[in-house]
From Swiss-Prot:
It is found in: Cytoplasm. GO terms for molecular function: RNA binding. Belongs to the SmpB family. Disulfide bonds: none annotated. The gene is smpB. This is SsrA-binding protein. It holds the Pfam family SmpB. Required for rescue of stalled ribosomes mediated by trans-translation. Binds to transfer-messenger RNA (tmRNA), required for stable association of tmRNA with ribosomes. tmRNA and SmpB together mimic tRNA shape, replacing the anticodon stem-loop with SmpB. tmRNA is encoded by the ssrA gene; the 2 termini fold to resemble tRNA(Ala) and it encodes a 'tag peptide', a short internal open reading frame. During trans-translation Ala-aminoacylated tmRNA acts like a tRNA, entering the A-site of stalled ribosomes, displacing the stalled mRNA. It comes from the Bacteria. GO terms for biological process: trans-translation. InterPro entries: SmpB, SsrA-bd_prot, SsrA-bd_prot_CS. It comes from Photorhabdus laumondii subsp. laumondii (strain DSM 15139 / CIP 105565 / TT01). PANTHER family: SSRA-BINDING PROTEIN, TMRNA-BINDING COMPONENT OF TRANS-TRANSLATION TAGGING COMPLEX.
Amino acid sequence: MTKKKAHKPGSATIAMNRRARHEYFIEEEFEAGLSLQGWEVKSLRAGKANISDSYVLLKDGDAYLFGATITPLNVASSHVVCDPMRSRKLLLNQRELDSLYGRVNREGYTVVALSLYWKNAWCKVRIGVAKGKKAHDKRSDIKEREWKLDKARIMKNAGR
């Protein structure tokens, strides 16, 4: 009988899109599976993925992930053509697809990839329905973050 691998906390995340939370208000999040090829799974296990410029396009009743880069390994099979920027189909329920279509058809909404992670043996992508932030919204977020840090610093020093 084989031993189970020790699970390292935090090791399930492959890639994060930190820029998405800075540039968009995330209204709702969904978890979607990815339709991948064999070399892509190997590369994801090695952590060779980037989703910072990725977005989701809805067409023909399906959702596709565009702009995600999965860099092929050097030892990848030579008889398979490896396209690191190819569009990948997202695996969602029909109810979730309908919800995405309804929200994206509203003014100013888009769907962006937030994170790429492992759930058991399956690769999942967390996508979010987002609305773009204006420059003043970004500045107010920065002010709030700085105030939170200052408040924590003041409370820490007040106890001394």
